[in-house]
Structures are given as C-alpha cells and as structure tokens.
Amino acid sequence: MEVNGEIYRVAGPVVTVIGIKPRMYDVVKVGHEGLMGEVIRIKGEQATVQVYEDTSGLKPGEPVMNTGLPLSVELGPGLLESIYDGIQRPLPVLQEKMGNFIQRGVTANGLDRERVWEFKPTVSKGDEVKGGNILGLVQETKNIEHKIMVPPSISGTIKEIKAGSFKVDETICVLTDGTEISMMQKWPVRGPRPVAKKLMPTKPLITGQRILDGMFPIAKGGTAAIPGPFGSGKTVTQQQLAKWSDTDIVVYIGCGERGNEMADVLNEFPELEDPKTGRPLMERTVLIANTSNMPVAAREASVYTGITIAEYYRDMGYDVSLMADSSSRWAEAMREISSRLEEMPGEEGYPAYLSARLSEFYERAGAVNSLAGLDGSITVIGAVSPPGGDFSEPVTQNTLRIVKVFWALDAKLSQRRHFPSINWLTSYSLYTQGLADWYSENVGADWTQLRDDAMDLLQQESELQEIVQLVGSDALPEDQQLTLEVARMVREYFLQQNAFHPVDTYCPFDKQYKLLKSITRYGELATAALESGVPMNKIITIKSKDELAKVKFEENFDAALDVVMKKMDEEFAQIGGN
C-alpha cells in the first residue's frame, strides 16, 4: 500500500489526516486495513475524512492512501436483483468472503466481473455517437432490456462495434480517437446525471392503494413524504409501494432502519408476482441495505448510491420509483458527523445545511427527456420518522417544503386498527389538478367529482364528530346522521385496505372507481329515500349495505358488485326509496 499520508486524530467515524493533499469528496483508504472514507473538509494541511466502516482500533500514525477519485458507483448489467450495502458492495459476495457479519476493509466489485452478457449492437461502424446515445441492448432480466449507453462525457465516431457474449469490463466499442467503451461505466454519486430537459409530470403512479391513488395521488416523476410516529405503518406503506407501483424499476433503500425489515423484503419479493408482467418482483428491484447497526456515515452514501442507480435506469427511458426508509436516519447521521466536526448546530442540533442536502436529494427526482431522446422518470418517496410523531421537527418541516405530496400517518388511526393509517384531513397532494385530464380520459369523466364529494363527506364528518361526542348521533337531524353513515362507509369500505390479504393488498384503478361509485350510489339512493319519508333505521339496516363492505375481498369483484348493486336497488324499491 502506497503511503502518502497518515492519521492525525480519530473521533468516532470522523478521522483527521495529514499529508495527502486531496480534493473535496475524494475517496481515501484509511489505516492498515484500508478502510473506505470520503474527504468532507480540508483545512490547511489537514483533511477531515468520514469513514464508511467501523473505526475501532485506528490510531494516529497509521497510513492513509488517497485514491484521487470521488465516491462512484458501477453502472451496467447485473444491478437488478442485487442487494448492496451503502457503498455498493454486494452483500452476498461479502457473506461468501467473511460469513454473516461484515468485517472491516473488505472490498468487492459492485458488478460481477465473471458473468457473461449477450450484447446486441443497435449502431454500426462509422456512426457518430455522443454522451447518452444507446450502443446496444442486453437482456438483463426476462422483462427488462438493459440499454448500453455511451458515458455522458464521451463522443466520437465508431471505429469498431462488437456483438456477442462479453463480461461487463470487456470492450464492446472503439471510437476513432482510440476511446474504448465497455458495458460498465462509473459515475460519482454526488453529481446528478445530465439530461436533455426536464418535463412536467402528467401521469399518475398507480400504487394499488386506494387512499393514495384515489385521494392523494403522486405523479410519475413526483416526490412524496411519509412522516409518522413509530408503529404507524411507514415501512409497510413503503413496501406496498415497492411491491405494487406500476414502475419498471424499484430501488429500495433501507437507510438506518431495522435489519429484519430488509429481511422481510428479501423473503417476500422473490415470491410475489409483478401484476404487470407476472414475473417475481425481485427481477425489477435493486436493494440497498444500510441498517441501523451499520456505520452511520454510510447512510449518506446509501442515499446517493440509490439515486444514482435510479438515474441510470431513468436515462434508458424507464420509470423508476425510489423508496428511502428513512430520511430521518440519514439526517441523524448528518447531525452526528456535524457535531464531531464541531460545526455550529442549527435547529434541534441538526446542521445548518440540512435543508440544502435534503433538497439536493429530492431535486434529482423528476420526469425527463434523456440524452438518448427517451422519456423516463424517477419518483422519490421518502419516509420520515419524527420522534414522538412531532411534525414540527426540522426534518419533517424541511422535507415538506420540498415535496409535493404529504401522506401523514396518524398514530390514533393505527391504534384504531385503521390501515393504511394515513390521515385524510391533514394529508395533501399538489398533483391532483395536473392529473385531472389523465383521470378523465383513462378512468371516468366523473372521477374528479367522485373524489371531491368523498373528501367533502369526510370533512363534514369531522365537523359533526365534535357535536356527536357531546350529545350523541341520535340528537342530530336525520340528513346529518346519513352524512355520518356514508362517511363511515367511505372510511371503512374504501380507505381501509388490508396489506396482508391476497386480494385486497392490490386494488386496480378500475376497481377503485367502481367501489367509490357504488358508495356514492348508496348515498344518492338513501338521500332520495329520506326525502320521500322513509325512516332512517330502515335505510341503514338494508342488507346490501353490509354486503358492499365484503365485495372488495372477492376475486371476481365485478360479478360480486353487480349482484350487490342489483340487490341494493331492489331493497330501496321495497322500502319506498325509488
């Protein structure tokens, strides 16, 4: 190991070194074991390094080597179905090398150098190519065609292009200036990949979760935050989104959360089928596991590694969704590193640059036209874990300033066993208006009206609840009693959803539309019956109303709903409502 510097001081994950003359964010190898670290501050001859591995046992005087390169990820075929740690070391490879517990100083390539891929060129000798252009295709999984692109900084005329089976680091293309291009490229994680232009998000991300799709939709290329106290369902909601959202690629970052949550994902995803393709969900997924017992500094790296991989697939024209669970743990890591650096603390001890770092991350989301002329998107959904469910704390507040969708999880709802426990009164989506045209064309012309009516009902219910708690619902006029009843149906029949039920876990948009329309239909029939003098107790005791609650669990939903709605019309006719 070439020694060109040494350790001066060690303070937890922060190490001060002298004699290496680095640039900001250069990767350095620290100590005799060559622990990986990144330069985060330079002051005179001293450089401060955050180390991405455990620093126990390091001492002043140990050697430090500067690689001269920024922290980069390897991009190419073989990313899908992988599970990495925060600095893109494949965990299965590390397990083979050293067993179930990660030891220090072990390196592993992000992409398998021995695996062979079949490359089919789409360009010819003599063609002009520039950064981002597609050279050829590799079938990475059964449904994902991996487009091999020219690295963004390279352009020229093709002198030679090969076809056949190659390893990722073998040359597949040579330009006239002698530049060799392989299937693999490296990209520094802190810099966003270039695009031709950013686009307005116009299509919704269909998640199969009724409260998200129906009430608070997110667009493909949008940003969302899921804040909530412990046990309110953040991780289950994130996993539901990773399982069922209609994107091509999912990048799931477990950032500082429990290890058994990542184990759940690893156990479930290979067995679950993608509703679009019928293939195992793992085939479209990249997992980055940086659990709470791993070094805190690597949490920052894991977030940047994940978004860079997402950008790479976006540049191929794919829709990517990225789940970060949880950005609060990353912010806590920033706070710890900042305090070790003795920086002036901001609100609640977080560094003053917390907002800048969060926006830097979320701004890498978006719908774009790539350098290859293809439309792709990254949808970023970040969980936030405010201590005690306090939404006024800095991480939640700074995140809310950046994102356009706010899914507020409520501990009271989760205690009442209402899941997903997203509070419909405090949540919001700023994409609703922009997506209205899409809903009119693809779902139903009356969808927006149905949604607005349901939200009005829930708002009225919340206002009436204050009176009900004082005097009871029987003291209300009958029309207000009916409002409470229909609002309860919207809550229990539509908003509640069982993530562990084989049918109800995923609800297609067509089914959501029909279910909400049937509840609205009951409200219309009941109002007409009430106005024609039918007593309230007869209206709320009809059997078809209770049967409507069970329809969403039926595999043959359309047939079951038709039977219930026909019965409802008959029952209202019998009691004199029609």
UniProtKB/Swiss-Prot annotation:
GO terms for cellular component: plasma membrane; proton-transporting two-sector ATPase complex, catalytic domain. It is a peripheral membrane protein. The lineage of its organism: Archaea, Methanobacteriati, Methanobacteriota, Stenosarchaea group, Methanomicrobia. InterPro entries: ATP-synt_VA_C, ATP-synth_a_Xtn, ATP_synth_asu-like_sf, ATP_synth_asu_arc, ATPase_a/bsu_AS, ATPase_F1/V1/A1_a/bsu_N, ATPase_F1/V1/A1_a/bsu_N_sf, ATPase_F1/V1/A1_a/bsu_nucl-bd. It is found in: Cell membrane. Has multiple subunits with at least A(3), B(3), C, D, E, F, H, I and proteolipid K(x). Its EC number is 7.1.2.2. Its main location: membrane. GO terms for biological process: proton motive force-driven plasma membrane ATP synthesis. Component of the A-type ATP synthase that produces ATP from ADP in the presence of a proton gradient across the membrane. The A chain is the catalytic subunit. It comes from Methanococcoides burtonii (strain DSM 6242 / NBRC 107633 / OCM 468 / ACE-M). It comes from the Archaea. ATP binds at residues 228-235. GO terms for molecular function: ATP binding; proton-transporting ATP synthase activity, rotational mechanism; proton-transporting ATPase activity, rotational mechanism. Pfam families: ATP-synt_ab, ATP-synt_ab_N, ATP-synt_ab_Xtn, ATP-synt_VA_C. This is A-type ATP synthase subunit A. It catalyses: ATP + H2O + 4 H(+)(in) = ADP + phosphate + 5 H(+)(out). Keywords: ATP synthesis, ATP-binding, Cell membrane, Hydrogen ion transport, Ion transport, Membrane, Nucleotide-binding, Translocase, Transport. Belongs to the ATPase alpha/beta chains family.
